[in-house]
C-alpha cells in the first residue's frame, strides 16, 4: 500500500487495484475472491482506495464465476458495498 501511495497521483488507485487483482489471479481455486475482498476491506486503505479496489474486483466477478456464484460472493460483502457489487454484476450480464 505504501509503495502505491508514493506513485504519481494518477497511478495510485490503479496500483491498489493491481494488488487486489494479483490476489484474485493467484488465489486458491474456487475461492479466489476471498483475499482480494479482504484486502479491499483493509482499514489501511483510505475510502477512495477501498472504493476503487472493490469496483475493480466486483467488475471481474462475472468474468470469473457463473452468475449465481457471483451473486453469492456479493452476499459476503458488508453493507452498502453489497448493492454496489450487485450493480456491477448486473451491468456486466446485461451487456
What is each PLM-predicted segment?
Residues 1-95:
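Non-catalytic tandem-repeat scaffold regions and their flanking low-complexity/translocation tails
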Amino acid at each position: 500500500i505504501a509503495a502505491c501511495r508514493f506513485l504519481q497521483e494518477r497511478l495510485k488507485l490503479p496500483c491498489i487495484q493491481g494488488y487486489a487483482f494479483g490476489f484474485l489471479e493467484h488465489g486458491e481455486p474456487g475461492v479466489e475472491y476471498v483475499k482480494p475482498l479482504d484486502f479491499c476491506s483493509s482499514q489501511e486503505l483510505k475510502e477512495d482506495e477501498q472504493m476503487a479496489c472493490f469496483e475493480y474486483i466486483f467488475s471481474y466477478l462475472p468474468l470469473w464465476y457463473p452468475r449465481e456464484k457471483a451473486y453469492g460472493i456479493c452476499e459476503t460483502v458488508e453493507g452498502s458495498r453489497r448493492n454496489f457489487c450487485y450493480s456491477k454484476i448486473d451491468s456486466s450480464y446485461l451487456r
